[in-house]
């Protein structure tokens, strides 16, 4: 069990998402980085659909209220327990009274804190994935208590995992659509040769890209 002291960016509960509700205007939601959920599940020997805490852009600080086991996956953040560094893509035991701190991601945008037994969160349409813009779930805030869904007394070794390589690519694929031919060929060529960077205003709905020079 954890208590939120501070959240530096945006953080929500996520699992593998919900499907079959587009006709009702409800998107699938779910973790932005599915690989991270499976990596966390492997480290903690649990269901990949277990509820995890997703961080966008920055991490947070947490009080450890009960002994527990966690795993850290996704975009690498500087992590520490009582100011002692913690390895990423690794499972760790956290002991009552400690303080966990997660910083800003260094090689991606979405980072994940997994709790053995999963976090306890309401199931809405079969999923605990939050989508605050649709009134489903909420962001995490200071003083929130993040409880464990299932208690498991079986002891596990702390493990590390080599993550699937997905953070070093800097190339985007351009998929032409029925409107592409409406742009002059010179504009399309300039677009494909332009270097973009990720804007801080990005969110779970999409990643905003910025560039220097005139628009398209």
Predicted regions located by residue number:
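Conserved "landmark" site that anchors the functional core of diverse proteins
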Residues: 1-216
């Amino acid at each position: 069990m954890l208590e939120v002291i501070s959240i530096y960016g945006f953080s929500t509960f996520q699992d593998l998402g919900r499907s079959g509700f587009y006709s009702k205007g409800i998107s699938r939601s779910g973790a932005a980085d599915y690989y991270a959920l499976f990596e966390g599940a492997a480290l903690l020997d649990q269901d990949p659909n277990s509820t995890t805490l997703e961080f966008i852009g920055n991490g947070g600080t947490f009080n450890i209220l009960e002994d527990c086991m966690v795993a850290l996956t996704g975009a690498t953040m500087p992590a520490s327990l009582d100011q002692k560094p913690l390895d990423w893509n690794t499972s760790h035991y956290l002991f009552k009274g400690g303080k966990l701190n997660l910083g800003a991601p260094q090689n991606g945008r979405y980072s994940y804190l997994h709790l053995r037994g999963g976090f306890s969160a309401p199931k809405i349409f079969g999923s605990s994935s939050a989508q605050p813009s649709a009134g489903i779930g909420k962001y995490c805030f200071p003083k929130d208590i993040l409880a464990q869904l299932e208690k498991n007394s079986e002891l596990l070794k702390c493990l590390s995992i080599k993550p699937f390589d997905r953070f070093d690519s800097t190339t985007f694929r351009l998929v032409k659509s029925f409107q592409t031919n409406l742009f002059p060929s010179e504009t399309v060529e300039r677009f494909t040769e332009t270097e973009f960077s990720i804007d801080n205003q990005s969110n779970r709905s999409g990643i905003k890209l910025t560039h220097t020079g005139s628009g398209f």
